Regions:
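Gly/Ser/Thr-rich phosphate-binding loop
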Residues: 38, 54, 59-64, 72-134, ...
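Flexible lysine-rich "adenylation lid" loop at the C-terminal edge of ANL adenylation domains
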Residues: 278-293
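Conserved AMP-binding/adenylation subdomain of ANL enzymes
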Residues: 2-86
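Conserved ATP/PPi-binding loop(s) of AMP-dependent carboxylate-activating enzymes
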Residues: 141-144, 152-176, 196, 213-215
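AMP-binding/adenylate-forming catalytic core of the ANL superfamily
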Residues: 159, 164-165, 188-271
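Short Gly/Pro-enriched turn/cap motifs at secondary-structure boundaries
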Residues: 136-142, 179-180
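Active-site glycine-centered loops adjacent to acidic/histidine catalytic or metal-binding residues
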Residues: 94, 117, 140, 187, ...
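Thr-Gly-centered strand-to-loop micro-motif
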Residues: 19-20, 91-93, 150-151, 157-158, ...
Length: 293
């Protein structure tokens, strides 16, 4: 919040925050109390009626999930920014975000931050305010409030903000907290030479081929999303093949097939998408806006 005041050069700045996240999401629950403590308004909207809610409850800042960021990006890139009203800051959380999309939003005047955490870390974790092209897609750097490491590519955290375990569930606790107290998040990540962490996928989503090769569906989804005809996409294993599920207009299906063919030429053989399914309807998502696999 102090950063918003600094950016606007106004210590008395009043900001209305909108969240579309369900209240069982710790990010939304935390915002509810934090913004109230600051004396700022908290607007509770719905993903299904976002634009109506934004018009009815003007907001300057918002907690955003990928599907909403994509929609806002489309509005700005097609000259429909009037639909967004006073909105000028996005707190991106809950999943991976395309760096180019975030950079486009930044170039159109949006203040971008990325937050990473979970219920098991009491919402704390990493935060990124960097707005340069190299780091805008990062979830942040280690700020010293807890220990962070990568264990075979999996992001792990340990410290005072991290839970001791699940209530009356020692078996569940043992699956995610090791003997040294490290919480294994299930998120795959990499760290660059500047100490910035970048999510690369979810451990449970990794496709393990008969050859023993591992394929991150999120990596391929990021490539598919660069096709202008693709509205939404998901990559899965089907019949021992890597299959792309794409939501697009029927008239654009051949353009998508051509894009996949060209993309495959840039990939190792084991990562290539050899099947594609099309959907005219939006792909199913859960209450937090994440694709249901």
């Amino acid at each position: 919040m102090a950063r918003f005041c600094q950016l606007k050069n106004d210590p008395d700045l009043l900001v209305s925050h909108m969240t579309l996240l369900p209240m069982f999401h710790l990010g939304a629950f935390g915002c509810l109390f934090t913004w109230a403590w600051m004396g700022w308004a908290q607007n509770l909207g719905s993903l299904r009626s976002f634009y109506k809610d934004l018009k009815r409850m003007p907001s300057q800042d918002m907690a955003a999930v990928p599907v909403l960021v994509q929609s806002i990006h489309h509005d700005l890139m097609t000259g429909k920014q009037d639909k967004l009203g006073d909105l000028w800051a996005l707190n991106c959380m809950s999943a991976m975000f395309d760096p180019q999309t975030l950079m486009d939003l930044h170039d159109h005047g949006m203040v971008i931050s990325q937050l990473y955490g979970s219920t098991e870390t009491t919402g704390g974790g990493l935060i990124n305010f960097a707005e340069d092209a190299k780091h805008i897609g990062s979830i942040g750097k280690d700020d010293g409030h807890c220990e962070i490491k990568l264990d075979n590519g999996e992001l792990c955290m340990r410290g005072g903000d991290v839970m001791l375990g699940y209530y009356k569930d020692p078996e569940g606790t043992a699956e995610v907290v090791d003997a040294e107290g490290w919480f294994h998040t299930g998120d795959l990540a990499r760290v660059d030479e500047d100490g910035y962490y970048f999510l690369t996928g979810r451990k449970k989503n990794v496709i393990i081929l008969d050859s023993g090769e591992n394929v991150s569906p999120e990596e391929l989804e990021g490539l598919l999303a660069k096709c202008p005809a693709v509205k939404e996409c998901l990559v899965k294993e089907k019949g021992k093949k890597i299959c792309a599920v794409v939501c697009c207009e029927e008239a654009d299906q051949q353009a998508v097939r051509d894009f996949i063919t060209e993309t495959n030429r840039t990939l190792p053989l084991y990562k290539r998408m050899s099947a594609v399914e099309f959907s005219a309807q939006p792909l199913p998502r859960n209450a937090m806006g994440k694709l249901m696999r």
